[in-house]
C-alpha cells in the first residue's frame, strides 16, 4: 500500500474523532463554567455549550468548553500548583531535617554545658580561689569546643594541646606563687616541650584527645550533614517547570475539564509517566541521596556505641581532674626534672628563687567519676532511635516523589477504561517508565532530551557526593573542614528554614501513616521536553492498523 493511502486513512480517522459529537446536540458547559469560576476566574467569554476545539494548542482538539484564553489560564494555573506542591513536599522534608537538627543540637549543647558546669562546681569546691583565678583557662577550652562544633575552622587537637600547655603554666606558677613572676617565657616554653617526655598529667591528655576529638568530629559532621541535606532539598525543590513539561501537566490535570470529563480521574500509570518525565532530573539525585542518608545513619548509630556520646562529653572534667591530681602528686619530681632540663634561671637572667621543694597545698583536686544515669542512657537511646527512623523515612524521597504526587488524585488500578488517558475516558496502555533521566528516552508523555541534564540538579548531586565523603571521613575519626563550602551551606541550619518557610510539626511526606502531598510538582530547569499533545495514542494506532489490513485484503 502506498503512502498516499496511509495518509488518507489517518486524515479520515482524525476527522471522525474530532467529529464524534457532531451528530448530536452540543453538550452544556455548565459544569465547566462552575469549575472555572470556582478557581476564581471570570466567566466572560466562557462558552455556554461546547464549541469546536481546533483552536486548542495543548488539549485534544475535539468538541470543548475551553477557549484559547481559558486553556492558557488553566495551563498557568497547573504550573503554579505543580511547582507549589513540589516545594511543599520539599518543605516537609526540610521540616523533618530541621527538627532532627534542633533536637540533636539541643541535646549536644546540653551535654557540653552540663559538662562545663560540673567541672566548675567540682573545682570551685576543691580549689576555691585558686580555681577562680585560673577559671579562664577552662572556659577558653569549652569556648573552643563550642566554636569547633559550630563549624569554626580550627584544629581541635591543637586546641586541646594549647589548653594543656596553659594549664601546665598556671600550675607551675601556682606551685610557688611568690616566685611565679620570675618564670621567663623561655623557661615556660622549654617546660612545655618536656611534657611529651615527662608526662606531668599522666595519661589523661592522651585519653581525652583520643575520644573527644572523634566524638566532636562526628557530631559536627552530623549537624553539617543535616544542614547540607536541607539546603539541597530546598534548591532542588525550587527548580522551575519547563514550558514543555508544563504542557504535559496541563494535559494531565485540566484538559479533562475542557473535554467535559472533569469528574474522570487520570489513569494512574498515565500520571506516573508524566511525573517521572517531569521529575526525571530530580530522580537522578537518588543514588547519592541514599548514600548520604546511609552514612548519616551510621554516624547517628555511633553516638550510642561505647563510649557513648554523654560519657565522652562528661569525661572532660574527669580527665582534667585526673590530670591536675597527677600533676599535684608529682610536682616535686616534675619540677626537679624540668629545672634540670631547662635550667633554673628566671627573667632577665636572674637566678630563680623557686624552691626545689614546692609547697604542699592544703586544698587538692579529687579525681571525678562519671556514671551515666538510667535516664541519661534512655534519652540517648531515644535520640538515636528517633534520628534513625526519621532519616530512614526520607531515604527514598526522590524516587517516591512521582508516585506520592499522583497519590489520591488518580483513578484506582481496577477502574480499567474509566480513567483519563490524556485523550479521552479510556484505558491507558503504555508501560510505566523507570526512574531517572536515562529511562525517559521512550516516555510517551514527556519526551526529554537525555543529553541535556539540569545544571542546578547536577551541582547538587556533586555536593551530595562531597558531603557523603566527609561523613565517611568523620566515621574514621578524620577531621573534616566544612569551610570551603560555606557559600553552599552557610551557617547552622541555613537549609532548614529558608525564606521563613519552616514547617513546624508537619507530618512527613513519606513513611508510615503520613498524608501524601497532593497532585503535581515542579519540573527541571533548562531541560528539553516535548509535549505529547500530537502523539498517536495506542487506540488510534489500532484503528489505523484495522483500516490498513482491510485495504491489504483488496
UniProtKB/Swiss-Prot annotation:
It holds the Pfam family Glypican. InterPro entries: Glypican, Glypican_CS. GO terms for molecular function: fibroblast growth factor binding. GO terms for biological process: cell migration; common bile duct development; intrahepatic bile duct development; negative regulation of fibroblast growth factor receptor signaling pathway; regulation of protein localization to membrane. Disulfide bonds join 29-65, 59-255, 66-258, 190-342, 245-278, 267-419, 271-406. Keywords: Cell membrane, Disulfide bond, Glycoprotein, GPI-anchor, Heparan sulfate, Lipoprotein, Membrane, Proteoglycan, Secreted, Signal. It is found in: Cell membrane. The keyword Lipoprotein applies. One of its GO terms (cellular component) is synapse. Residues 1-18 form the signal peptide. It is a lipid-anchor; GPI-anchor. Belongs to the glypican family. This is Glypican-1.
Amino acid at each position: 500500500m502506498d503512502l498516499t493511502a496511509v495518509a488518507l486513512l489517518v486524515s479520515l480517522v482524525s476527522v471522525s474523532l474530532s467529529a464524534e459529537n457532531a451528530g448530536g446536540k452540543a453538550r452544556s458547559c455548565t459544569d465547566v463554567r462552575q469549575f472555572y469560576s470556582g478557581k476564581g476566574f471570570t466567566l466572560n467569554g466562557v462558552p455556554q455549550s461546547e464549541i469546536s476545539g481546533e483552536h486548542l494548542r495543548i488539549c485534544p482538539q475535539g468538541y470543548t468548553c475551553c477557549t484559547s484564553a481559558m486553556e492558557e489560564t488553566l495551563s498557568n494555573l497547573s504550573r503554579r500548583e505543580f511547582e507549589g506542591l513540589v516545594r511543599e513536599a520539599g518543605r516537609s522534608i526540610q521540616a523533618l531535617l530541621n527538627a532532627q537538627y534542633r533536637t540533636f543540637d539541643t541535646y549536644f549543647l546540653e551535654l557540653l554545658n552540663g559538662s562545663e558546669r560540673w567541672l566548675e562546681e567540682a573545682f570551685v569546691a576543691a580549689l576555691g580561689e585558686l580555681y577562680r583565678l585560673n577559671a579562664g583557662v577552662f572556659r577558653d577550652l569549652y569556648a573552643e569546643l563550642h566554636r569547633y562544633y559550630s563549624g569554626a575552622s580550627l584544629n581541635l587537637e591543637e586546641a586541646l594541646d594549647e589548653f594543656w600547655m596553659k594549664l601546665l603554666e598556671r600550675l607551675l606558677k601556682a606551685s610557688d606563687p611568690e616566685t611565679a613572676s620570675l618564670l621567663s617565657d623561655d623557661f615556660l616554653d622549654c617546660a612545655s616541650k618536656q611534657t611529651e617526655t615527662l608526662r606531668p598529667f599522666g595519661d589523661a591528655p592522651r585519653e581525652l584527645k583520643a575520644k573527644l576529638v572523634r566524638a566532636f568530629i562526628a557530631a559536627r559532621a552530623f549537624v553539617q550533614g543535616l544542614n547540607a541535606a536541607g539546603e539541597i532539598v530546598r534548591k532542588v525543590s525550587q527548580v522551575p517547570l519547563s514550558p514543555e513539561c508544563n504542557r504535559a501537566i496541563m494535559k494531565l490535570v485540566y484538559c479533562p475539564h475542557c473535554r467535559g470529563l472533569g469528574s474522570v480521574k487520570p489513569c494512574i500509570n498515565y500520571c506516573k509517566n508524566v511525573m517521572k518525565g517531569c521529575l526525571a532530573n530530580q530522580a537522578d539525585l537518588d543514588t547519592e541521596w541514599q548514600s548520604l542518608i546511609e552514612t548519616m545513619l551510621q554516624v547517628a548509630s555511633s553516638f550510642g556505641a561505647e563510649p557513648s556520646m554523654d560519657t565522652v562529653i562528661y569525661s572532660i572534667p574527669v580527665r582534667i581532674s585526673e590530670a591536675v591530681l597527677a600533676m599535684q602528686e608529682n610536682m616535686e619530681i616534675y619540677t626537679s626534672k624540668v629545672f634540670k632540663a631547662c635550667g633554673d634561671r628566671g627573667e632577665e637572667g636572674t637566678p630563680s628563687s623557686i624552691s626545689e621543694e614546692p609547697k604542699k597545698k592544703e586544698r587538692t583536686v579529687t579525681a571525678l567519676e562519671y556514671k551515666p544515669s538510667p535516664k541519661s542512657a534512655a534519652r540517648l537511646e531515644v535520640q538515636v532511635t528517633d534520628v534513625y527512623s526519621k532519616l530512614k523515612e526520607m531515604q527514598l524521597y526522590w524516587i517516591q516523589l512521582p508516585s506520592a504526587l499522583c497519590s489520591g488524585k488518580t483513578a484506582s488500578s481496577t477502574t480499567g477504561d474509566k480513567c483519563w488517558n490524556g485523550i479521552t475516558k479510556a484505558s491507558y496502555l503504555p508501560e510505566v517508565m523507570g526512574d531517572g533521566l536515562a529511562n525517559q528516552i521512550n516516555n510517551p508523555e514527556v519526551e526529554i532530551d537525555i543529553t541535556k541534564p539540569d545544571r542546578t540538579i547536577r551541582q547538587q548531586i556533586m555536593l551530595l557526593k562531597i558531603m557523603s565523603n566527609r561523613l565517611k571521613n568523620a566515621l574514621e575519626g578524620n577531621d573534616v573542614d566544612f569551610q570551603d563550602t560555606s557559600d553552599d551551606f552557610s551557617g547552622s541550619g541555613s537549609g532548614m528554614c529558608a525564606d521563613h518557610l519552616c514547617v513546624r510539626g508537619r507530618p512527613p511526606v513519606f513513611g508510615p501513616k503520613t498524608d501524601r502531598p497532593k497532585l503535581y510538582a515542579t519540573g527541571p530547569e533548562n531541560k528539553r521536553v516535548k509535549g505529547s499533545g500530537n502523539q498517536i495514542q495506542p487506540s488510534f494506532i489500532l484503528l489505523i492498523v484495522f483500516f490498513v489490513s482491510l485495504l491489504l485484503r483488496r
